[in-house]
């Protein structure tokens, strides 16, 4: 039968659970924790059904792994939309059909998040050089930078974002020494056969953009909190403590940690 997350193990699920749903359990504004909730208990109950370690050996059948979504063996795919071009490979390559953007299971059924990527900046409210700091950060928000080739990931300037999205409706090309465009096709391998991936239609691009506009969560990540969860959940996974006992301990430890570090 089909699995929800494929070969995902417990630790990976806990990382996803906090990255996508961490705001359900920690209010980043007030510092109030909510780990002794029914939704968190439900997530630990599900995590218990997952394997502790990946049972696959080193000789993984690459085609078998790549085709798990096309063959309906795995239901959910962790789609990372850094730009619509890469998104096309994931949707038309891995999935091979129209998809639904459902997000990770969260309390408000809206478990998709915005991530700042590898580089992000914060301006200290106590800075003595706020204007200089702002001018430095501002350069990355200007139309010149947002439309430049330096920016590989998704632009935050809407006009630049829409222009970039439009590229996903066009066939890829490279430019020869005479400045002429040489077009080619994106391809994917399915069961040893090469298939052509057609560019997105305008309707498909519009649908993806509309989904992106609805995302209003940011990814949550705190290694200390995740370690607390993993450490204490082991007793539940090993049937040494009930899920209620474990979440009460997690709630206490997490709240102390948050209070001490605010």
Question: Could you say what each language-model-derived stretch is?
Answer:
Residues 1-9, 143-155, 256-262:
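Bilobed periplasmic-binding protein-like "clamshell/Venus-flytrap" ligand-binding domains
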Residues 41-51, 66, 124, 133-142, ...:
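Non-transmembrane alpha-helical segments in soluble domains
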Residues 62-77, 82, 89, 231, ...:
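Short helices/loops that flank or line small-molecule/ion binding pockets
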Residues 195, 217-219, 231, 240-262:
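Conserved N-terminal structural module of periplasmic/extracytoplasmic solute-binding proteins
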Residues 102, 151-235:
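Long, aromatic- and glycine/proline-rich binding clefts that accommodate carbohydrate-like moieties
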Residues 52, 91-169, 213:
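Extracytoplasmic/periplasmic substrate-recognition and gating elements
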Residues 29-62, 99-100, 104:
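Glycine-centered hinge/linker elements that transmit conformational signals in sensory
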Residues 1-33, 72-76:
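Extracytoplasmic/periplasmic solute-binding protein
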